[in-house]
């Protein structure tokens, strides 16, 4: 039987300007800010996360697995699976779609 999928929290990465105040931070570091905020807003801890699906428009130069780097920076345990979705403008929406499809099967 399929379970209902709900969004309990949302946060996005900070938006900056080229060579602006956020220039010294990597995309995974900014992702950590978003994950930390989403967890706080939902009232859950990193240990309660089952999977991290995160869109990343331009992963070049970010190192391996930007979603993993972001989740670790937010205190999510290493045992939690992470997926980086590289789909340019649609990566965030694709993350929501994959999460909904994955959860409904369990």
Regions found by a protein language model. Name each.
Residues 105-106:
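Conserved small/polar residues in nucleotide/adenosyl-binding loops
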Residues 1-80:
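Conserved "HGTGT" condensation-loop signature of ketosynthase/thiolase-family condensing enzymes
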Residues 82-91:
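Active-site nucleophile and cofactor-binding loops and adjacent substrate-binding regions
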